[in-house]
Amino acid sequence: MTHPTELPLSPLSALQFYATAPYPCSYLDGRVARSQVATPSHLINSDIYTELVKAGFRRSGVFTYRPYCDGCRACVPVRVPVDAFAPSRTQRRMWKRHRTLVATVSPLHYDEEHYALYMRYQSARHAGGGMDRDSRDQYEQFLLQSRINSRLVEFRDLDAPGGEPGKLRMVSMIDILGDGLSSVYTFFEPDDQHTSYGTYNILWQIEQAKSLGLPYVYLGYWIRESPKMAYKANFHPLEGLIDGRWKILDPERIDLPPVDAALARAPLPGGHSGSG
């Protein structure tokens, strides 16, 4: 993604943008990254956040950012145009396999069972990355703080005999934007092998967007060099934000320069960047 020279005057004119100091990239080992941050957070409502997402921003709690790395365009914002989406045979099979899961949509809230699942997921999938040691406060700041129209979705098995709730399998946080749903974060039962819960969750979001009359599901960033991001390229068609324009993305032929570690470590220019 290229560095922006300007942002639309409205409705973003009240915001300020600044570049962070360099920090270790969380997606590509050995890389140095930085972000462009939108502030102040209390002015970022659902309408403004919709415009920011269209410009490649994401959020973590109330922290709204996009990649702003020197010499690197590895992070490509991607979205699925839901009316044109055509599931693959594997995706259709996955949808059928998990059709008995019961999805419950609610406002963001803390639940001890959710937090326990989150910790099991982090310990199994991201051990040693820091998030496997998240306290309850850190969990809440990361996933349960939002100033926009956000929802928590839990996926359970069918209720057990006697009315007991079915086993919790997955929890997903989503934002409802003016032009789509934005997938914030998903965690699931790590002991369930070969379930592709993450793929099922995106398929569910696509169906929800259709039912709400929303044209897109935003999937965050796709990174060609990151195996963890490979699944996003399996949704067709897929649009990517390239050089400031959303266009159909061909992951096999995308014209991006290779990630250059030397350039990624280049000295940062002084002062604010972007529009701030």
Swiss-Prot record:
Keywords: Acyltransferase, Cytoplasm, Transferase. InterPro entries: Acyl_CoA_acyltransferase (IPR016181), Asp_Glu_LeuTrfase (IPR017138), N-end_Aminoacyl_Trfase (IPR030700), N-end_Aminoacyl_Trfase_C (IPR007472), N-end_Aminoacyl_Trfase_N (IPR007471). Its EC number is 2.3.2.29. It catalyses: N-terminal L-glutamyl-[protein] + L-leucyl-tRNA(Leu) = N-terminal L-leucyl-L-glutamyl-[protein] + tRNA(Leu) + H(+); N-terminal L-aspartyl-[protein] + L-leucyl-tRNA(Leu) = N-terminal L-leucyl-L-aspartyl-[protein] + tRNA(Leu) + H(+). Coiled coil: none annotated. The keyword Lipid metabolism does not apply. It is found in: Cytoplasm. GO terms for biological process: ubiquitin-dependent protein catabolic process via the N-end rule pathway. One of its GO terms (molecular function) is leucyl-tRNA--protein transferase activity. One of its GO terms (cellular component) is cytoplasm. It comes from the Bacteria. It is an enzyme of class 2 (transferase). Functions in the N-end rule pathway of protein degradation where it conjugates Leu from its aminoacyl-tRNA to the N-termini of proteins containing an N-terminal aspartate or glutamate. Belongs to the R-transferase family. Bpt subfamily. This is Aspartate/glutamate leucyltransferase. The lineage of its organism: Bacteria, Pseudomonadati, Pseudomonadota, Betaproteobacteria, Burkholderiales.
